């Protein structure tokens, strides 16, 4: 599933679902890719010079693979806490940051992403750029860990 966060002319935000048959709207600042199917992966390949991140790449724990700059932008792999009953486990997310487009990839549902999407839908967060989205996700992660 691919969700897109768009910044509107009045600086409000909207979240919509994107299908591979549609062109990418020009006002998208965040593409959130959750468990993409083959058709979605093929569509995403058209947006990248490099390969779209695979689940095994996101699970690589080498510190040298957590951050790099490539032809598609800045690539960041980050571990997010996910609470399941009384347990907390780490779930990896991959981010590609471009000039004003953040593309996130995940293979699991992550409560912090759900929380940010809730804040966006209910205008409870001030976001003006793709970088703001990335920073807010990291901020929410720190809040949850503390």
Where are these predicted regions, by residue range?
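Peripheral, non-transmembrane regulatory/ligand-interaction domains of membrane transport proteins
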Residues: 1-146
